[in-house]
Amino acid sequence: MTPDDEAVAEVIALERALLTREVRSSAAALDELLDPEFTETGVSGRRWTRAEILAELLAEADAEAEAEAGQDRIADHTMAGRWLAADVVMLTFETDHEGRRVRRVSLWRRSGGRWRVLYHQGTLVPPAPAQETAPPAAQ
């Protein structure tokens, strides 16, 4: 594995950590992983600042803990990364959570020797149309 591959693997591990209830419920962990200039465009199209998303994630974690529902980690699929610049990696992946599939992209920036997510966007994947099934063949 090349150093570039190792860095992408590290960023993927950090993104997957962000999908865990443990990290999403920890202000300190989120503070370490979100870049000071972090912004997000959510599936609704709303733009979120770093402060807004921190508050939202912590509130969601509290609600999940109270309900004792949900899973410990949001399921992700096909996560892949590629370098965009010397210190910027883009991740693309899909998640399934609460009955919704979302296509996602995150930009991670390395600064001071550590990786932090700079930008994140989610786009809702519409449900696939129901497949019609052919009636059973006549005997």
What is the predicted role of each segment?
Residues 2-32, 37-139:
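A beta-strand edge to alpha-helix "cap/lid" segment located at domain peripheries
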